[in-house]
Every structure is written in C-alpha cells, then in structure tokens.
C-alpha cells in the first residue's frame, strides 16, 4: 500500500456514476436472475461483458486524468455494493421491503419527498433462504481482469477493489435460514474469505465496505441500546477479522459510514463510541 510520504495521495470510496449503457446491463441481469423465464436479453452476455469492460477502462482512465492516485473500477459491474454477492453466493432469493433509518422515520415529510424524487433504490435485496457458499467465481474473475487491464493501460499509482463485509451483507439481506444471526455472519465470512484473498492475490488493494459498523446503529440495530449495539458491532469485527486472517494488513483498507443518503442523521452513533471498535479491525 502506498503511503502519503511526499504528498497526500488522493483516492475515494469506490462507487462511481454508471453510464446508461452500464445501468441497462445491470438491470437486465437483475431481471434475468429474478425470473429466469423473463425476457431479459436487452444485452447478450458477451455484449454486457464488453460494456462493463469498456466502462472500467474509461473510469480508470478518467480517474488518472483527474489526478486520483489510488483508483477503483467504480464498481461498474455491481448493482449495489452489498447485494452484488447474491450473484456470487448460494442461499439468496426473493426481495426485502425497504425500511428507512430511524432518523428518517422521525421526519415523515422528508421521507415522503425522498420517495417522490425516486431516491429509493429499485434493485432487489434478496434474503438468505438457504446455505451460504461460493456459487460462481466468474463475476469476481471478470472484475479482476477488467481492473488489471485498465490499470496496465492508465498506469495509476495503485488500484483498489471493493468487497462487502459480512456485516453489511447481513444488514441489507436478512436471515431467514440460519438459526441465529451469529451463525449467518459466520457463514457469510467463510464464503467471502475467498473473494478477499483473490483480490489481494491479484495485486490489488482490498477495500472492505463496512457501513454496518456505523449505519447499522440506526437501521438493523435501531431498537437496541447503544451498549448492545457496541457488543454486536464488536462481533461483526471479530467475524471480519477471521475472514481476513490470511490477508496482510498493509493490503487492506476499510470504509465505514453512517449512510450516504440525505437525512438528518441525528441518530448516528458518535465517533467517540465508534472509533475504539473500528480500530480493532
């Protein structure tokens, strides 16, 4: 991992705007996976892959042109930073009703305006309905190939790739199968471990996306006392650390946030309570 020794290196969280062509590919895939009998052939598989590869090449080139040192693929192939795992792991199906954060619940007028503006995501959030295991490594292999090819062409200082934490997958995709939430988290960690290790083995920095450690407070664990949230968040970190046990610390970084949505955020867990937990990762 490059360090800011001579100057402050520039980077970002990972997800970048998609073109309409990319959006069309992602939602065509979404429709096909939701209903195998649906006519979701807006793009043939080869064409869709070519669209994504071209988008990755362009977004990496653009980042380098703008002076970004540590670039990403913009998550071009992912419809969501957390639900993308349903394409790669077994055990997910259906959809999950949206539940706004506690801060928005207390401002129903704002919540209604956000809904009217189309701020609510339209993609599915599958639920865990069966055993979690690796299903298909093809999407990850394609992501790694596309990013490495783009990096060879644009020559940034370094590149990173996003991967969801076990906790954030559990936050957006509830458990209907495992006996306990802890069993679910453990299964997710075991299945995601190979993705984490493959990214690092490809010579790319791994970024763990873990908003569950902050946003989880006013969403999944909204009804829990703060002390109980801290205990649960600590368990999320233990599970994550186990999944990362073979990854050198200098090859991984972590993204934690309270949710990138327009809202009052008055239920955000305070940094002074959060930081001691996060530093255990």
Per-segment meaning from a language model:
Residues 1-281:
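Domain-level signal for soluble alpha/beta catalytic cores
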């Amino acid at each position: 991992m490059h360090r800011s020794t001579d100057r402050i290196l520039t980077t970002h969280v990972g997800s970048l705007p998609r073109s309409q062509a990319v959006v069309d590919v992602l939602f065509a895939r979404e429709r096909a996976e939701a209903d195998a009998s649906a006519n979701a052939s807006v793009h043939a598989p080869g064409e869709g892959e070519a669209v994504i590869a071209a988008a990755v090449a362009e977004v990496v080139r653009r980042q380098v042109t703008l002076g970004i040192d540590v670039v990403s693929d913009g998550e071009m192939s992912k419809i969501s930073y957390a639900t993308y795992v349903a394409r790669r792991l077994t055990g997910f199906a259906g959809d999950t009703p949206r539940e706004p954060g506690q801060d928005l619940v207390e401002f129903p007028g704002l919540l209604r305006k956000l809904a009217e503006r189309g701020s609510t995501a339209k993609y599915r959030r599958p639920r865990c309905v069966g055993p979690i295991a690796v299903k298909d490594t093809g999407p990850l292999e394609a992501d790694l190939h596309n990013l490495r090819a783009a990096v060879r062409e644009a020559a940034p200082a370094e590149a990173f790739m996003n991967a969801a934490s076990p906790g954030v997958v559990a936050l957006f995709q509830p458990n209907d199968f495992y006996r306990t939430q802890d069993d679910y988290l453990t299964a997710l960690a075991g299945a995601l471990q190979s993705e984490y290790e493959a990214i690092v083995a490809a010579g790319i920095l791994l970024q763990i996306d873990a908003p569950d450690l902050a946003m989880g407070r006013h969403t999944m664990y909204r009804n829990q006392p703060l002390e109980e949230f801290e205990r649960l968040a600590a368990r999320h970190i233990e599970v994550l650390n186990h999944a990362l046990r073979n990854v050198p610390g200098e090859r991984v970084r972590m993204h934690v946030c309270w949710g990138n949505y327009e809202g009052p955020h008055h239920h955000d867990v305070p940094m002074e309570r959060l930081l001691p937990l996060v530093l255990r990762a």
